[in-house]
Structure formats: structure tokens, C-alpha cells
Amino acid sequence: VAILGDGEDSRQRDREARREGRRHKSSMVFQSFGLLPHKSVRDNVAYGLKVRGESKQVCTERALHWINTVGLKGYENKYPHQLSGGMRQRVGLARALAADTDIILMDEAFSALDPLIRAEMQDQLLELQKTLHKTIVFITHDLDEAVRIGNRIAILKDGKLIQVGTPREILHSPADEYVDRFVQRRAAVV
């Protein structure tokens, strides 16, 4: 599967261009938080900006803005081990948002959270997206989650793209037997 950035296939770029693209065009929220244990919440959120070469003032201002926005005001000087799983995931989200990239990759970002915190994080992401209008690639194995937060869903099997469509298209017009079974499995649980 190719990733296009500014209409260009990322696989065709040289190593340095791909590195620059990762620094300036995309940010990531990991399933296992990906926080630096020896850095405070503020420093974790500012980390991508620092690596990119932003000034200390810009790093601090953006970090504090996004810490407040994701509901962690008052926790900027805490360390990851002092936070709950949901709070740690908010730090990861704030770090991705602080970088102000065009694309945010979220790899199973909410899967390790309990159902209530997970729903809270989904709500927060949907609210933020109303004003951000970012391209968010949200990887999940949970069709309910995909239907809830996605405006387009891509279903893959064994590394191959099987179907892309709106949630409605996926649910009501499965492309093949695999997608149909995937959808039916969801219906059986509900």
C-alpha cells in the first residue's frame, strides 16, 4: 500500500526526503503510548518539536496548549509512571497534535484502554477533528471503533486491501465473503 504525500508516492522518495516527511508531515500515536519515562509530560509533548529544531519557547507554548486541550492541565510536570493509561494516551495524542502535521497515524491507539476511557478518547478525538480537519489514519481491529470514528474505512486481509468505503458501504455492501463475515461477526456481538 502506497502512502501519498503531496501527491507523491512516499516509496519513491530518497531516505532524507522520507525522514523530513516524518518530521514535518506526519506524527504518530502508538498503542503502547511511546512515552519517554525520564521526561515530564511537557517534555514528552514537546519532544517532536525539539527534534525538529523548534525554539524552546515554541516547544513550551505548543506543549502547554495541547496539554490543556487534551485535559491534562496541572499534569505538565508529572512523569509517565505517575499517570493512568488514559492519561498517558492523552500525552501521546497531545504530542502528535503539537507537531501540527498534516497526517496523524494512530496505531491501535485506544486498544489498551478500558472501555469507558476508550469511549472518552474516541469522543475527544471526534471533537478535536471538528476543528483540526487533519488526515487521521486510525488503525484498529475493532469494526465498531472504525465505524464510530471513521468517515472512510479500509479493510485489509493478509496485507492486501480488500475494501475501502464509508462505514455505511462497508456495513451494507461488503465487497467479498471475508468482509461479510467481519461485518456479521460484529452484528452477532451486538
Where are these regions (language model features)?
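ABC ATPase "signature
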Residues: 164-165, 173
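Conserved H-loop
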Residues: 31, 133-139, 141-142
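A short, surface-exposed alpha-helical micro-motif characterized by mixed small hydrophobic
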Residues: 146-148
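ABC family nucleotide-binding domain
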Residues: 1-117, 121
